[in-house]
């Protein structure tokens, strides 16, 4: 099973972005979703679902918050989920 983690795009340089995932800045490749939206505007501030360093899809903020809440609930039961959220067990 693959789990994507929501993150908010902070900066973009070409197809690479700095994405905030639970307060941690991660390097993410935007090749699959593009660095600009359908109107040609940079995706800075938008939410993406991140898996193994790639933005897999663009999601809205409500979906991002719901997913983060669900992952946090999983973390409360299974500490290994912390690696997805925080980069290590917390």
UniProtKB/Swiss-Prot annotation:
Q: Which InterPro entries match?
A: Hydgase_assmbl_chp_CS, Hydrogenase_HupF/HypC
GO MF, one example: carbon dioxide binding
Q: Where is this site: Important for interaction with HypD and the precursor form of hydrogenase?
A: 2
Q: Which residues form the signal peptide?
A: none
Q: Which Pfam families match?
A: HupF_HypC (PF01455)
Phenotype upon knockout is:
Deletion of both hybG and hypC completely abolishes hydrogenase activity.
Q: Name one GO biological process term.
A: protein-containing complex assembly
Effect caused by changing residue 2 to R/S: Lack of hydrogenase 3 activity. Cannot interact with pre-HycE or HypD
Q: Annotated pathway, please?
A: Protein modification; [NiFe] hydrogenase maturation
The record's annotation in NCBIfam families points to: hypC_hupF (TIGR00074), PRK10409.1 (NF007712)
Q: Which family does it belong to?
A: Belongs to the HupF/HypC family.
Function description: Involved in the maturation of [NiFe] hydrogenases. Involved in the biosynthesis of the Fe(CN)(2)CO cofactor. HypC delivers iron-bound CO(2) to HypD where reduction to CO probably occurs. In complex with HypD, accepts the cyanide ligand generated by HypF and HypE, and also coordinates the carbon monoxide ligand. Involved in the maturation of the hydrogenase 3. Also participates in the maturation of hydrogenase 1.
Report quaternary structure and partners.
Homodimer. Interacts with HypD. Also forms a complex with HypD and HypE. Interacts with the precursor form of HycE (pre-HycE), the large subunit of hydrogenase 3.
Protein name as annotated: Hydrogenase maturation factor HypC
Q: Which organism is it from?
A: Escherichia coli (strain K12)
Supply the source organism's classification. Bacteria, Pseudomonadati, Pseudomonadota, Gammaproteobacteria, Enterobacterales
